[in-house]
Design a protein with these regions (language model features):
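A residue-level detector for the "anchor" residue at the start of short, highly conserved motifs
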Residues: 1-225
Length: 225
């Protein structure tokens, strides 16, 4: 994890926190909000955070336990969605390269709003808002407690996730590159949970058994067939 203080504000925040591949980190924001960052995640916030607003900007995945402040809602702006909360616990997965963005609510209430449509949905605990970027559509589904946000405990978990998003997640955790020979299988879905120190070939074998894909490992590149 590294933290920078941007004197000349050229992006969205004065403070930027970044995790690298395979790295996870914890921090506490000035208002007492607790944040856990997953691998390859960038979080930014301004110097006036906690005074005039509680806006943060996220590219990647983070779990939040939000300090209560009814006068200043906590807002996560994340690659096409805004998530607003007052005091609650939730997870946002919003990597720039992923086809779907998810917000998972564990306690309290949050409002999730795509920036393009302004179609706001309200989540209750044990619900997930899934935003499909290609269709510009958001839907609310129940979540499996065994799968969501387990990355904080050292697990890689997928819940009906597209294969193309699973391989992006594996790239971030295993420092490899996936290449597809068959583009049509990117939309295959898979659910499962693995320890994040599990051998990559073991994970791929389980996915292969359940989806019928084939793969070949060429040093740091995995070819999906």
């Amino acid at each position: 994890l590294y933290l920078t203080n941007q004197e000349n504000l050229s992006t969205v925040g004065n403070y930027k926190l970044v995790t690298s591949k395979g790295e996870k980190s914890y921090l506490q924001l000035p208002d007492g909000t607790k944040v856990w960052l997953n691998s390859c995640t960038t979080l930014e916030y301004a110097e006036n955070y906690g005074h005039s607003n509680r806006n943060i900007y996220l590219d990647g995945e983070a779990y939040f336990e939000v300090a209560k402040n009814k006068d200043l809602p906590f807002v996560v702006k994340a690659n096409g969605i805004d998530v607003k909360a007052i005091g609650t616990a939730f997870n946002v997965s919003a990597y720039m390269e992923d086809s779907q963005l998810t917000t998972t609510l564990f306690s309290g209430k949050v409002a999730v709003q795509p920036t393009l449509t302004k179609q706001e949905v309200l989540l209750e605990p044990n619900q997930v808002a899934v935003y499909d970027k290609s269709r510009n559509k958001i839907e609310v589904v129940p979540y499996d407690k065994k799968l969501f946000a387990q990355w904080r405990g050292g697990f890689l978990s997928f819940e009906m996730m597209y294969l193309q998003d699973i391989t992006k997640l594996l790239e971030r955790n295993y420092n490899v590159v996936f290449r597809y020979e068959n583009q049509g299988i990117k939309k295959l879905r898979f659910s499962g949970s693995f320890r994040n120190n599990e051998d990559l070939s073991e994970i791929l074998n389980v996915i292969k058994t359940n989806t019928g894909i084939r793969y070949q490992i060429l040093k740091d590149t995995i070819v999906i067939k």
